[in-house]
UniProtKB/Swiss-Prot annotation:
Pfam families: Radical_SAM (PF04055), TRAM (PF01938), UPF0004 (PF00919). The keyword Nuclease does not apply. [4Fe-4S] cluster 1 binds at residues 45, 82, 116. GO terms for molecular function: 4 iron, 4 sulfur cluster binding; metal ion binding; N6-isopentenyladenosine methylthiotransferase activity. It comes from Xanthomonas oryzae pv. oryzae (strain MAFF 311018). Its main location: cytoplasm. CDD domains: Radical_SAM. It catalyses: N(6)-dimethylallyladenosine(37) in tRNA + (sulfur carrier)-SH + AH2 + 2 S-adenosyl-L-methionine = 2-methylsulfanyl-N(6)-dimethylallyladenosine(37) in tRNA + (sulfur carrier)-H + 5'-deoxyadenosine + L-methionine + A + S-adenosyl-L-homocysteine + 2 H(+). Residues 428-450 are annotated as: Disordered. Its EC number is 2.8.4.3. This is tRNA-2-methylthio-N(6)-dimethylallyladenosine synthase. Keywords: 4Fe-4S, Cytoplasm, Iron, Iron-sulfur, Metal-binding, S-adenosyl-L-methionine, Transferase, tRNA processing.
């Protein structure tokens, strides 16, 4: 179906889609006057990458701060933290200790801590590292200009780790495209409270952005040349975006499937991805979107965590291994060749060898293409942190190595099977491996390197895969006029 322009969206409809308000065409804004330098160190997930980009946008617009990759020349240095992995707090304080020297000689450098560790630790960060000027959570990054001004005027450290729901999205500047692919956050937080996870405590309960607000951001990015949209959320397929007169009591709600259908009609958007999902929220509506929307990438990341029902219950995941496989079967009925990746936690408290073998059986049955897998890391304040854990670390590491080796071997076989096929690739830029070549990603998230004209950057091209490498593919453009 032909693309829908921004101005046409007031009348565009998807299957069961609401009538939408006219969306503004993005116009280039005047560049801010540069009044200083900003350095941001980002740890963790894609949500943090998105948040860091928004911090940069906010401070460029309000304070005239320009990004630098050298903290020593920065006027403001920020670390955007992640609390998922073990010893996250200690890593943050180690980073801060290295930055303390930036204030030597009385240089008025602002040092700030954001992200999930900031939410967890709050005032404790300033007590332990009194040279820290700002502590702010994921929901208050939009208040950075006010926090910086308050710090400079009062001379006191500022801490704001509140949860003002979706307010931050209302106070962010217009998005700026940094390439042909862009992330768009559509919701915040998680309400699942898995026993091992800190996210509900650091990012709050699930809150969805209004439906039309998301479409406005996507349309603005498309007008700037973005061709691939990555929809983000801690539990992205729980999205319920309000739309209607005032998005109030009488509002209706769009789920992720409807959002995808509608985004697919925006002119210029040629590919849609989303992450991260929860199996409990993997609805028939989403399966139908995979069936009906060709722009929806032939790839799904769906964290299962374990294959043992006993361990899944202890994790409070809310589904069984059989129920997970049932969802995959439904999806493969409409997308038989879809690539599926997942998350695994090995060595969860009480995991026996039999439990682990059930995880390996699930991996064999599903045929995962990629995985993000780790040994269980105890997170203070979570229910699982109180569980007895008597499995030796050497056993856990051996299990993890076996799991990763199995999935890596299967992924290699998939890559090899792609040799001789034609893959649709979004050209992202010059290859890091060889600047004379171009690089992009296939639908199943494999880097593809190939010779080509730099003018193709930002376009989709059909690439004939000629070789499978350990972590990438090589190929050549199938036709000279294949860009579209």
């Amino acid at each position: 179906m032909p693309g829908t322009s921004v101005s046409d969206l007031s009348t565009a409809t998807a299957v069961d889609a609401p009538a939408l308000l006219p969306l503004p065409v993005a116009r280039p804004s005047a560049p801010a006057v540069v009044r200083g330098k900003l350095y941001i160190k980002t740890h963790g997930c894609q949500m943090n990458e998105y948040d860091s980009a928004k911090m940069a946008d906010v401070l460029a617009a309000s304070e005239g701060l320009e990004l630098t990759d050298n903290p020593e020349e920065a006027d403001v240095v920020l670390v955007n933290t992640c609390s998922i992995r073990e010893k996250a707090q200690e890593k943050v304080f180690s980073q801060l200790g290295r930055w303390k020297a930036l204030k030597a000689g009385g240089k008025p450098v602002i040092i700030g801590v954001g992200g999930c560790v900031a939410s967890q630790e709050g005032e404790a960060i300033v007590k332990r590292a009194p040279y820290v000027d700002l502590v702010f959570g994921p929901q208050t990054l939009h208040r950075l200009p006010e926090l910086i001004r308050a710090r400079r005027e009062s001379g006191k450290s500022q801490v704001d780790i509140s949860f003002p729901e979706i307010e931050k999205f209302d106070r962010l500047p217009e998005p700026r495209a940094e390439g042909p692919s862009a992330f768009v956050s559509i919701m915040e937080g998680c309400s699942k409270y898995c026993s091992f996870c800190v996210v509900p405590y650091t990012r709050g309960e699930e809150v969805s952005r209004p439906f039309e607000d998301v479409l406005v951001e996507v349309a603005q990015l498309a007008a700037q040349g973005v061709r691939e949209i990555n929809l983000l959320g801690q539990n992205v397929n729980a999205y319920r975006g309000a739309y209607g007169a005032d998005a109030g009591d009488a509002a209706q709600y769009a789920d992720l499937g409807l959002l995808i259908r509608t985004i697919a009609q925006i002119e210029g958007i040629g590919r849609i991805r989303f992450t991260t999902s929860h199996p409990l929220e993997f609805s028939d509506s989403l399966v139908d979107a995979y069936r009906d929307v060709p722009q929806l990438a032939n790839y799904l990341h769906l964290p299962v965590q374990a294959g043992s029902d006993r361990i899944l219950s202890a994790m409070k995941r809310g589904y069984t291994a059989l129920e997970f496989k049932s969802r995959i079967r439904k999806l493969r009925a409409v997308r038989p060749d879809i690539s599926i990746s997942s998350d695994f936690i090995v060595g969860f408290p009480g995991e026996t060898e039999a439990d682990f073998e059930k995880t390996m059986k699930l991996i064999e049955d599903v045929g995962f293409d990629q995985s993000f897998s780790f040994v269980y890391s105890r997170r203070p304040g979570t229910p699982a942190s109180d569980l007895q854990d008597d499995t030796p670390e050497t056993v856990k590491q051996a299990r993890l190595a076996r799991l990763q080796a199995h999935i890596s071997a299967h992924a290699a076989s998939i890559s090899q099977s792609m040799v001789g096929s034609v893959q649709r690739v979004l050209v992202e830029g010059p290859s890091r491996r060889d600047p004379n070549e171009l690089t992009g990603k296939s639908e199943n998230m494999r880097p593809v390197n190939f010779p080509g004209n730099p003018r193709l950057i930002g376009q989709f091209v059909d690439v004939l895969i000629t070789e499978a490498m350990s972590n990438s593919l090589r190929g050549r453009i199938q036709l000279d006029d294949s860009a579209h």
